[in-house]
UniProtKB/Swiss-Prot annotation:
The keyword Coiled coil does not apply. It comes from Rattus norvegicus. Plays a key role in steroid hormone synthesis by enhancing the metabolism of cholesterol into pregnenolone. Mediates the transfer of cholesterol from the outer mitochondrial membrane to the inner mitochondrial membrane where it is cleaved to pregnenolone. Signal peptide: none annotated. Residues 66-279 form the START domain. It is found in: Mitochondrion. The keyword Phosphoprotein applies. GO terms for cellular component: mitochondrial crista; mitochondrion; neuronal cell body. GO terms for molecular function: cholesterol binding; cholesterol transfer activity. Its main location: mitochondrion. The gene is Star. This is Steroidogenic acute regulatory protein, mitochondrial.
């Protein structure tokens, strides 16, 4: 009698667990389908359109692993940031030149409805893509060592192999006219063929409340796109879309100057870092 009761309870529990697992998988698939539906515009030709199409297949990528509801939310936010950022980059209309350096580094900008003014850095680097990926992703927390505009970056939480929650403390800028800011962001990293995309946007993380004496700013949909120069795999084209709400009261002229200058300085500091720091065996 006891044995029969045990078997009955065990069978019911097993069916319940199977049903729960199935429901979680259905939820994951629903998220993937919703992201696919929200993708900006129709699939477009070229490498950027290919990345957008493939990155929307979230459901099938997550089926094998179960995440908490909060983790799924962060993964979804990262995917949405990537879709929005790539959608902005893919629209070639309306870009205006902010500055251009003698070495060819260029910053463009435009106003995007619902987002605000965004900045686009175009850089060609004499380094293979895997080397950039190593420095920008694998060594992310070391960025404060070579980029004086960043005091510190910490990974607060890692979710799977593609998603992280980070806290970034930025230095004061424009002769201290812009005081120190910090950012809490969800970041998503994907590789599609020969292209790597590093995307992110602001998020809420309860374990990192606002800090005293620092203004909590927010990243809008932001991304870096890395892909080898056609015919020269030892060189990499880097495109950085920057969207930031610095918060506080600041004249637009100062904001525009600070953000475009930040991108130019980033390219310069990154080059020096790549030339002076040895590469490891990291691969994108």
């Amino acid at each position: 009698m006891l044995l029969a009761t045990f078997k009955l309870c065990a069978g019911s529990s097993y069916r319940h667990m199977r049903n729960m697992k199935g429901l979680r998988h259905q939820a994951v698939l629903a998220i993937g389908q919703e992201l696919n539906r929200r993708a900006l515009g129709d699939p477009s030709p070229g490498w950027m359109g290919q990345v957008r199409r493939r990155s929307s297949l979230l459901g099938s990528q997550l089926e094998a692993t179960l995440y908490s509801d909060q983790e799924l939310s962060y993964i979804q936010q990262g995917e949405e940031a990537m879709q929005k950022a790539l959608g902005i980059l893919n629209n070639q209309e309306g870009w205006k030149k902010e500055s251009q350096q003698e070495n060819g580094d260029e910053v463009l900008s435009k106003v995007v409805p619902g987002v605000g003014k965004v900045f686009r850095l175009e850089v060609l680097l004499d380094q293979p893509m895997d080397r950039l990926y190593e420095e920008l992703v694998d060594r992310m927390e070391a960025m404060g060592e070579w980029n004086p505009n960043v005091k510190e970056i910490k990974v607060l939480k890692k979710i799977g192999k593609d998603t992280v929650i980070t806290h970034e403390l930025a230095a004061a800028a424009a002769g201290n006219l812009v005081g120190p800011r910090d950012f809490v962001s969800v970041r998503c990293t994907k590789r599609r063929g020969s292209t790597c995309v590093l995307a992110g946007m602001a998020t809420h993380f309860g374990e990192m409340p606002e800090q005293s004496g620092v203004i909590r700013a927010e990243h809008g949909p932001t991304c870096m796109v890395l892909h080898p120069l056609a015919g020269s795999p030892s060189k990499t084209k880097l495109t950085w879309l920057l969207s930031i709400d610095l918060k506080g009261w600041l004249p637009k002229t100062i904001i525009n100057q600070v953000l475009s200058q930040t991108q130019i300085e980033f390219a310069s500091h990154l080059r020096k870092r790549l030339e002076s720091s040895p590469a490891s065996e990291a691969q994108c």
